Design a protein with these regions (language model features):
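Conserved hydrolase catalytic core segment
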Residues: 154-166
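Post-His helix in hydrolase/transferase enzymes
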Residues: 239-248
Length: 248
């Protein structure tokens, strides 16, 4: 068995409770709405150097289902976990990219877009459009959280050359929804594409040892363990060392 790198110590800035969440973005981030073919997508952007690459943080699936298992009317995330990571990234060009229908309400949106069709070609294409509008011809590093990890993988497989994606980072990432729904007995995502082929680009996958939402072994089944960093005692949205991620 290949050696898995386990981080045993945490330095400085650890996100361990909701009390540490930022309610307001830093002054150097601006809220920008991006219009694509089918959606208006919410972003928070810090662009300081037109000649540098862009790091784009792609949100997870958000609040897709309520506690009774029914689709919600608003999939906006309840947690600011990924936003906080993006806001603490000191790189010159950093963007937090929400998923379709998050933060922006519309009667025209269909809950299929954040439930069984959350990784459909329609979603994939619109997210790729947004990334292109954000980055233009700049190189891109995609950082996907939870279900956003799978979406990033699909985008890389379909649009890597067009979008100049040079690296893929995942945090508590879902990399195969078929295995995930089967394991938990969830409704299959029948209108979604799956990540049947892992992108062949430089990549790092941060997984929480105690993640009960997306167990780390599910991620380790999908990718080379040499590209995985198992964070001891980390859960799905707690215990990750932000500095390790943003400085990757």
């Amino acid at each position: 068995m290949k050696k898995i790198l386990i981080y045993l110590s945490f330095i400085s800035f650890i996100l361990c409770s909701c009390a540490s969440l930022q309610t307001n973005p830093p002054k150097d981030f601006s809220y920008v709405e991006i219009k694509t073919d089918d959606y208006v997508l919410a972003t928070w952007q810090k662009i300081k150097d037109e000649n540098s690459l862009v790091k784009i943080y792609v949100e997870g699936d958000g609040h897709a289902y309520n506690s009774k298992g029914y689709p919600t009317k608003d999939p906006t995330p309840k947690s600011h976990f990924l936003r906080d990571i993006a806001f603490n990234d000191t790189s010159e060009n950093v963007v937090y990219l929400a998923r379709p229908c998050q933060y922006i309400k519309s009667d025209e949106y269909d809950n299929v877009d954040w439930t069984t069709g959350r990784y459909s070609y329609k979603i994939l294409n619109n997210m790729a459009q947004a990334i292109k509008k954000i980055a233009g011809d700049k190189n891109v590093i995609l950082i996907g959280y939870s279900g956003g990890a799978l979406l990033c993988g699909l985008i890389i497989n379909h649009y890597q050359e067009e979008l100049k994606i040079i690296r893929w980072i995942t945090i508590a990432g879902l990399l195969n929804h078929t295995r995930w729904t089967k394991y938990f007995g969830y409704i299959p995502l029948k209108y979604s594409l799956d990540l049947d082929t892992i992108p062949n680009i430089p990549q790092t996958h941060y997984v929480g040892e105690k993640d009960t939402i997306i167990p780390c072994w599910l991620t380790l089944q999908c990718v080379d363990e040499r590209n995985c960093v198992v964070i001891e005692n980390a859960a799905h949205d707690k215990g990750f060392n932000i500095k390790d991620i943003v400085n990757n």
